[in-house]
Amino acid sequence: MPEKAGKGKIGNTNFNVTDPDGHTVEIVQYEPDSWTRREKGKYIPATRISTHMAHVGVMVGVLDPAMKFYHDILGFQEFWRGSASGKVLSWVNMRVPDGDDYLEFMLYSTPPDAAQMGTKNHVCLFTPNIEKAVATLEARPARKNYRRPIEIKIGVNGKRQANLFDPDGTRIELMEPNTTDGKPVAPSTVPAPK
């Protein structure tokens, strides 16, 4: 951690650190006189698909160093674990210290190539009704330039979701905030990848 944090170009106090997997993590304090506070809400149209960025998903190779960094140093709290196979852990969700947003660790045992990293690392946007959100996207003029299908699926976490990819291949996940049956999915107890 730096001894002193500087002010960024838009007036917020910030600094960067690198996590154990090489991801740059920017720590930001929104200042009262910053562009962020001054312009809050001005560029958000009523036609937007989402009003809340729920989480960011990042690839993690070894769970213990990531837990030490995000939990022990930054104060994130684990609240759910999931497994795609039922044999080895796939995800660990870590809530920020002072809110409901979270970081999703996506665990791997074999390092992914650059193309896989781009489709795995992602931003998740909450939408209250995934069917309505997808219908809105399908009706937009820009849809004719987006060649991939937009499919609604139910994730291991029991929530309906759809994935889109920006022109660089980065995944954008749209997800409903609640499970399909209104009950939380029990966390997985299987071991992390080796």
Placement of each model-derived feature along the sequence:
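Short hydrophobic/aromatic beta-strand micro-patches
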Residues: 59, 124-126
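Flexible internal linker/loop segments at domain or repeat junctions
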Residues: 103-110
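Amphipathic alpha-helical segments
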Residues: 62-80
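Short amphipathic alpha-helices within nucleic acid-binding modules
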Residues: 130-137
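Vicinal oxygen chelate
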Residues: 1-52, 58, 80-84, 90-95, ...
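Eukaryotic phosphotyrosine signaling hubs
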Residues: 54, 120-121
